A protein has these predicted regions:
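Repeated scaffold domains used in trafficking and secretory/extracellular systems
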Residues: 1, 36-46, 79-88, 118-129, ...
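A short loop-to-beta-strand structural motif that recurs across blades of beta-propeller domains
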Residues: 17-19, 60-62, 100-102, 142-144, ...
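Short loop/turn segments that connect beta-strands within beta-propeller blades
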Residues: 22-26, 64-69, 105-109, 146-151, ...
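Short glycine/acidic-enriched loop and turn motifs that connect beta-strands
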Residues: 7-12, 54-58, 97-99, 136-140, ...
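Solenoidal tandem-repeat scaffolds enriched in leucines and small polar residues
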Residues: 82-146
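A short beta-strand motif characteristic of beta-propeller blades
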Residues: 27-33, 69-76, 110-116, 152-158, ...
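Residue position within the beta-strands of beta-propeller blades
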Residues: 3-6, 50-53, 91-95, 132-134, ...
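Hydrophilic extracytoplasmic domains
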Residues: 181, 198, 204-209, 213-219, ...
Length: 299
């Protein structure tokens, strides 16, 4: 069973829906639709869906049951919450009003700020009580870690470039990438994208490879691929060894910003964003044998 957000143009605006596919071959079922705003990040916990949404210009976190009924907001519009991520009994969301990352329980209670004000929307990952995030200032990028139990912030890595991004966090393993630019004087003439794996416990860094553009870490594995869809797997137990190489059925989505994630973990599977027809995006879900499980298009 697969849930996803669909955005459909009606001629006067977009209508957002949470849809479900019960089997790879089945038609999509519209579970919940809003005509007043957007639907963004979401997760499913027990018998309810929790999601970021809006009513006109007011943004909030709401919830609805799996039948699309009993919908209600769990944060006030005044919080102006962006993003909806779950970890260890807490929902994490960025409050644009407070300009702070916050967390709260699934009923909206125990609302509290998380870490420093420098943690911005969309630039953090959460695992094992750690919030790992990046900060770019004055030509540098710093990767930091806030521990939600100790309430402490540690600096993990610092780079003399703003072309550094975090890509995923699984357990105590952080995947990040850095663009190593080649210059002649002050002019950039080329460069190489490099992925790295960092162990939060030991501080060990592993260089994983060059010229890959997308990657994620999940299910004790590391996935990397290039623009043409040439992919590889590595194990977290020995990240320097490529355990499998294969070709994706489609090249990754083109003409997209660096901050957009084209590869996402979906349970034990991976989902890839590829080019569809016209302005559509084709989503391909692949299972553990690295064969296509299902695909669908979204606007």
């Amino acid at each position: 069973m697969l849930y996803y957000v669909q955005m459909k143009w009606t001629g006067s605006g977009y209508v957002y829906s949470i849809c479900r596919k019960d089997t790879p071959a089945s038609d999509a079922v519209c579970v919940y639709t809003t005509n007043t705003g957007f639907i963004g990040d979401f997760f499913i916990l027990q018998d309810r869906i929790y999601f970021a949404t809006s009513v006109d210009k007011d943004r909030m976190i709401s919830t609805v049951d799996l039948n699309g009924e009993n919908a209600y907001a769990i944060t006030a519009c005044s919080r102006d919450c962006i993003g909806c991520y779950y970890s260890n009994g807490w929902i994490y969301s960025y409050s644009a009003k407070d300009d702070r990352l916050a967390r709260f329980r699934t009923d909206g209670s125990q609302y509290e700020w998380v870490g420093e004000a420098e943690i911005k929307s969309g630039w953090y990952y959460i695992s094992n009580g750690n919030v790992v995030y990046s900060v770019s200032n004055d030509g540098t990028t710093t990767i930091k870690c806030f521990n939600t139990e100790k309430k402490t912030t540690d600096t993990l890595k610092t780079f003399d470039t703003t072309s550094a991004w975090i890509n995923g966090l699984y357990g105590n393993h952080l995947l990040y990438e850095v663009y190593d630019a080649k210059k002649e004087g002050d002019v950039v003439t080329g460069g190489t994208m490099r992925f790295y794996l960092y162990n939060l416990n030991s501080g060990t860094d592993y260089t994983l490879g060059n010229d890959k553009i997308e990657g994620t870490v999940w299910n004790d594995q590391i996935f990397l691929c290039d623009k043409a869809g040439n992919a590889e797997l590595r194990s977290l137990q020995d990240p320097m060894i490529v355990t499998k190489e294969f070709k994706l059925p489609n090249a990754l989505l083109g003409n997209i910003s660096t901050s957009a994630r084209l590869v996402l973990a979906v349970g034990k599977n991976l989902a890839f964003a590829t080019d569809g027809e016209g302005s559509q995006v084709k989503i391909i879900l692949m299972y553990s044998e690295w064969k296509e499980l299902t695909s669908f298009t979204v606007n």
